[in-house]
Amino acid sequence: MGLEIVVKDIQEGASAEVSRIKAEGDAKASEIINEAKEVQKKTLGDSLAKAEEDLQNLHQQVISSANLEVKRITLNKRKDLLDKVYVQTVEKIKSMPASKKEELLKNILSKYEASGARVYSSKDSEDIVKKLTSLSYAGNLDAIGGIVLENEDGTVRLDFTYDSILKNVYERSLKQISDLLYG
């Protein structure tokens, strides 16, 4: 019977060892599962945070693109309007009464005549310019109106043609619009 007691002791010892190993295994498995859950939560949280950040960035890009498109459309509309005003102004200048043309030329010549020795004008304004100034008439220009003054040796030309004045106003207006829209 001594052998049965020894076998029983060995079985009880083995059973206790199996229970201990099983308990350690369960504890380790539970620990690994908990760690995996924590890693999963952190990964999910990081993924959600990244997705939110990406969504916010995309939202900002869409808003910026929309604002830029609105500015571009606005600039184009204003440019179209300036183009129309430019064409209308040219037509108004061309159809201006002779008395008004003479008055404008007289104002330009009274202010700037001393700066030149020769004067150029459009063919339409030639007779008026010759009447208003004692400067040497040097010829005709392809312009809608106004004059160009030139010094004695031809090195300096002052352009007071309406074409030039309109072009300068037009370009300044475009620059102002662009500055307003794009800072």
UniProtKB/Swiss-Prot annotation:
UniProt key word Cell membrane: yes
Family assignment from sequence similarity: Belongs to the V-ATPase E subunit family.
MF annotations from Gene Ontology: ATP binding; proton-transporting ATP synthase activity, rotational mechanism; proton-transporting ATPase activity, rotational mechanism
Organism from which the protein derives: Methanosarcina barkeri (strain Fusaro / DSM 804)
Lineage: Archaea, Methanobacteriati, Methanobacteriota, Stenosarchaea group, Methanomicrobia
UniProt topology in membrane: Peripheral membrane protein
GO biological process, any: proton motive force-driven plasma membrane ATP synthesis
Record localization: Cell membrane
Subunit structure, interactors included: Has multiple subunits with at least A(3), B(3), C, D, E, F, H, I and proteolipid K(x).
Pfam families associated with the record: vATP-synt_E (PF01991)
Keywords per UniProt: ATP synthesis, Cell membrane, Hydrogen ion transport, Ion transport, Membrane, Transport
Protein name: A-type ATP synthase subunit E
NCBIfam families: PRK02292.1 (NF002629)
Function of the protein: Component of the A-type ATP synthase that produces ATP from ADP in the presence of a proton gradient across the membrane.
Chief place of localization: membrane
Superkingdom in the source lineage: Archaea
Gene3D superfamilies: ATP synthase, E subunit, C-terminal
Cellular component aspect of the GO annotation: plasma membrane; proton-transporting two-sector ATPase complex, catalytic domain
Record's keyword annotation contains Transport: yes
Recorded name of the encoding gene: atpE
